Structures are given as C-alpha cells and as structure tokens.
Amino acid sequence: MAFTPGKWIHMVGIAGAGMSGIARVLAQQGYKVSGSDLQVNDTTSRLEEIGVEIFKGHSSSNLKEGVDLLVTSSAVPQDNIELRLAREKKIPILKRGQMLAHLANAKKAVAVAGAHGKTTTTSMLYMVLANCGTEPSFIVGGELQGSELNAKLGRGDYFVVEADESDASFLDLRPYIALITNVEDDHLDYYKSVDNIRKAFRQFVEQIRPEGFAMLYGGDAFNRSLVKDLTLNKRLLFYGEDLSNDYYFLNWESIGLGSHFDVYKRELGFLGRFELAVPGKHNALNALAAIASALELGLEMEPIKSALKNFHGARRRFQIQGQKALVTVVDDYAHHPTEIRATIDAARNFHSGRVIVVYQPHRYSRTQLLGRQLGEALINADLAIITEVYSAGEEAIPGISGEVVCQAAQSIGCHSVYIPQREEIIPYLLQICQENDLIITMGAGDIWKLGLQLLEVLPESVLKV
C-alpha cells in the first residue's frame, strides 16, 4: 500500500514502548490510528488525547471495516484473533520494526543500537539535537522524565530512534548515523550464536548511507574489529575513555546525583567541561556519544552543554521514585550483568549509606544463560533481594528460577536472599530498613511497582544508624 496520511492504521500491542511511540508519530502525521492491547495505561490515555482509538483486549470487533494496514508487535502471537482476521481480509501486515524503519528512513535516521545504554543515549541525542534547533523527530523505548513523551514528530531533517537488535529488526533501518554502544552475548534465544549477533551488527554498519558515519564505543572489541574489515567502506568514529578514541573524556568526577568531565577530540585537544544531572560513569559515556555525534553534525557546543546539564534521564533509568523516613527508593531497568554492575556502581559513587537491590530476573532463557553472571554482578550491593523470574511470556524452564541468581551471588560473598513471593518482600524490607538506605528496584519486568508500594507503607521514621 501507499503510505499516505489519511489512511487507517490499526496497531496490535499498542501499549508497548515502541508501538506507542510509532502510534504517536503516525497520528501527528495525519494517519487515522487505532490499536488494541491487553493492558491500557497512562501511555494509551495520552494517545487517546490526540485522537487514537484504544481497545482493551483483543477481539475481531477491534478490526473495523476500512482499516488499510495492521502493525503488530513482536510480543503478539501469530494466532492473535486480530492478526488472523487481517490475513483473512488480505489487509497488509507490518511488524513494528518495519513501520519504525518506514518512518525513520524517510528522514536522516540517527539510530542507536547496542546491548546497553540505548534508551538513555537516544534520549540524550534527541535532547541535544532539539536544543541545537534542528527540530528532530524521535521514538525511544522509554519516556523522557519531565515530558512524559516517548516520541514526537519534528519538522527537521533528523529522526532519532532507539534501534532494537533483539529480533534483528534494526536491519530494516538505513541510518545516516549508526551509533553502537557495545555488542554482547544477549538475545541468544533469537540469534543462537555470538557470531550471528556480530554479523547482524556488521550489516547494520554496512547499511549506513554513503554520506553518513558510525559512532562506536571504542572500549568494545567487536566495534574495534570493524577497523580491520577492509570490505567495510564506511566512516568509523570512536568514543570512550581511552586517548586512542576520536572523542574521549578525562577528569570524570561524581558530584551528587550527577557528574562533571572534560571532553577532548584527538586531533583538536580540549573541547570543554560538561555537567550531567544523572549519575555514573556509564552515563558520561552515553553523553559522550551524543556530544561526539552532535559535533560531527556541525552543531554548536554551548547548546549541547546546556541540553545535557538539564537532562534528567528517561523513565526507569535510575528514576528516583521518592523518599520517606530518609530512605530513598530508585527504580532502574537494568537486567543484564553489565547494566546491573554499572547501576550499583553509580549508586555507590554518590550514596554514603547502604545500597539495597531488589532484583527481578527477566526471562527464563536469559536466567538460564546468564544466571551466574547476573548473581556476580550484584556483588557491590550491601544486600540483594532476588525475586522470582519475570517470564515476559516465556514458558518456565525446569530448575531455572531466581534462586539460581541468588546462589551465584552468595557463592562470591554477596549478602543476598531469595524471596520468590512478591507479597513477602515489602514486610521483609520494613523489618530491615534504616535511615540513609538507598533501595533500588531493578529489572525489565514489573518490579518498579514494588518501589511505589513500599513508599506507601514506609513509616515516618525507621531505625537510625
């Protein structure tokens, strides 16, 4: 079909982070948009405010006469009743990644991929480009704190997107800038081997437009290996802490909930001192990727600085949920060993009290593959509480549970407990909480709800230390 505003697009699984962002941009472009999901939430309510029709649950009645195209999330099973009916009616069906690529490829796509830091880096890049006056469009996998938006249609040339490598859908993109944070052995349920993951990322770089470039984290071995690939005729730039990178930072300092650092370009030297309002050296690296990309686009330094100074993160990325009785509750999406370690280290950098982590393992397949590494990544927590696995729709695997992670943590001396029943965690926390504790709910599932529940029942005072 021809993609022209006015056509009717129905989206199955519309409440998801990626799908809801696409729905917003399509509606802003003038398409008629409807969608269904098992759960409705604040995001779908905001879509209704701009004219998107939302159906709770899946039903044949949701697919009205006149729908021109159906877009489906990868989380929706192929036997979904709305998908089946669309096939019967010969309504064209696109996957989420294909629709995202159609939108982004129509402009200069700035695509952020990699195992870690995608949402934060994408959000930073959007804020920087917007503050520099380029009026970019964006779709990101988490809401920007302070705006409650995960997408926006801009009038400018750039379209900043979080590229999803989990199912190789990022290979539908033809990026102007391909930014890769790092490449790790994640999503092996799809790729089957690390070699296949690397092949996909190489293809992603190969698909960069001739006038574009790759911005690559220089501390990643795979990214560095691309330099030796003589058949890859692309402009490759590197960022990181090491002075061998095209862009690097020195003199990083943790200051409160943020940090300061000096940015350099290899052939030019010192470029400026930057301030961040989000914690951790990993976020300084995310910011450096945004800084380097913006400077390569010829944008001015001062608006880049001010954008990052005023960036307060994306939802579920070290998000402070509240404080009560001098106990601070933070939520973070970290669900891979590298992310878990970085988040705990960031907390340690600014917090003088105890750091207590409530970690919810995500997916049985990931827990089976990375259970030991997940447990070992919790080592710097004063206490790690491990819950049962959040299945994300997967079938349970015999012998695989949160206890696997807990045993791995205990084996290296991490003080950890396995509490599979969610309703038992808050009473346990209430017994042990003391002043100046920092409690981090952590994982890609629904563990964030527990932090809010804890704040509701925390007494006005807890044990003093």
From Swiss-Prot:
It is found in: Cytoplasm. Keywords: ATP-binding, Cell cycle, Cell division, Cell shape, Cell wall biogenesis/degradation, Cytoplasm, Ligase, Nucleotide-binding, Peptidoglycan synthesis. GO terms for molecular function: ATP binding; UDP-N-acetylmuramate-L-alanine ligase activity. Its EC number is 6.3.2.8. GO terms for cellular component: cytoplasm. Pathway: Cell wall biogenesis; peptidoglycan biosynthesis. It is an enzyme of class 6 (ligase). ATP binds at residues 114-120. Pfam families: Mur_ligase (PF01225), Mur_ligase_C (PF02875), Mur_ligase_M (PF08245). InterPro entries: Mur-like_cat_sf (IPR036565), Mur_ligase_C (IPR004101), Mur_ligase_C_dom_sf (IPR036615), Mur_ligase_cen (IPR013221), Mur_ligase_N (IPR000713), MurCDEF_pg_biosynth (IPR050061), UDP-N-AcMur_Ala_ligase_MurC (IPR005758). It catalyses: UDP-N-acetyl-alpha-D-muramate + L-alanine + ATP = UDP-N-acetyl-alpha-D-muramoyl-L-alanine + ADP + phosphate + H(+). Belongs to the MurCDEF family. Cell wall formation. NCBIfam families: murC (TIGR01082). This is UDP-N-acetylmuramate--L-alanine ligase. It comes from Syntrophomonas wolfei subsp. wolfei (strain DSM 2245B / Goettingen). The gene is murC.
